[in-house]
Amino acid sequence: MLDTNEAIYRQYETLGISKEVLDFGTSVEKELKDRFDKIDTNAEYNQLKVIAAMQKNKVSAECFQASSGYGYNDLGRDTLERVYADCFGAEDALVRPQITCGTHALALALMSNLRPGDELLSPVGKPYDTLEEVIGIRPSKGSLAEYGITYAQVDLLPDGEFDYDGIKKAINEKTKLVTIQRSKGYATRPTLSVKRIGELIAFVKSIKPDVICMVDNCYGEFVEDTEPIQVGADMMVGSLIKNPGGGLAPIGGYIVGKKECVENAAYRLTSPGLGKEVGASLGVIQSFYQGFFLAPTVVSGALKGAIFAAKIYEKLGFKVVPDGTESRHDIIQAVEFNNRDAMIAFCEGIQAAAPIDSYVTPEPWAMPGYDSDVIMAAGAFVQGSSIELSADGPVKPPYAVYFQGGLTWYHAKLGILMSLQKLYERNLVKLD
């Protein structure tokens, strides 16, 4: 039988990782032991938090039964929503397979809690590209702008801090809802910590106490030991094919928060008079529970992968956001290559490391909702899942790629090493 380390080296070699790349990665990994230990501690806390919420709400095998048709009296669906509310510190929750993605969840939360004549304010700069059409920044059918809902935006200061003076000036009698995007999206600004989100919410409510503060929590669940609801957010929104689905949920989104806000969203999702009472869970409810149970552990692996990627590419001279030493507040790692070929090579490496479609070569394409070609690498069990190992980005300067996910740390590690291998083979990096 082979020595364990030798066997691992040979397995990496079988997968196409050279000794030079593996040695470089191993030296970086050794530097990260203390940070990895802290990630494990956070995962343990969040795992216990999820279990406590499940036990409090008496989750049973009956909860896994599929419902169909109207979905009246769906025990599993209703119990899961109480689990989400308790785990995230909210009054109520809407967790449904009928919410198709994160953008849908955000659109639902906005459209159900805003009325013609209201104004939406983003105090953290431009939102995700896909939200531009929801809001009406880029004209689109059914946007908020078409319904007479206006939009205001205050950019972050050059150092990434909130522009408190600008925010104060922007809040007016029409300001009904403030949207706070936690993650950076396709930008290189810092991701917001829960603490900073709490400070921003407190400032906004000191000016206008009745304003609704909504946090787009995509990519942020279970990264810290607290969530935005616990620091004053009225609504928190996310996708089940990101962190809270644990890689098992095949579809879905959630909205948690104040009861009135969640009820408004439920009536918009279904219809007035029906709200949360309808909406069959079909055959996915067990995967929703099991994915949520596994989510803290899955997120910990994704975090390790993000830090590993940052450290490796920082050592090679690339700009990385966050850098290799910063605290983490989401699972996304941005690497600026300033080179189209390097960006594409990175994505090819992520795809080549996948268990699914590893033989496919990703290419830039005109993805709906974006104003430039986008390249995506994602050999995932669930199409579009970004808690699974994936990388993507708009193919335009500074040619920044956004890496995230990995259902296990070891798969995330392989993906990063494979990305490095592709760059190394094409003489786009030197490992000296």
Which role fits each region the language model picked out?
Residues 2-29, 33, 40, 50-56, ...:
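Conserved PLP-enzyme active-site core in the AAT-like
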Residues 63, 67-68, 94-97, 331-336:
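Short glycine-rich or small-residue beta-strand-to-loop segments that form or flank ligand, phosphate
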Residues 83:
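Solvent-exposed, charged/polar functional surfaces in cytosolic regulatory/catalytic domains
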Residues 92-95, 118-121, 176-177, 210-213, ...:
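Structural motif
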Residues 314-431:
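Conserved C-terminal alpha-helix-loop-beta "cap" of PLP-dependent enzymes
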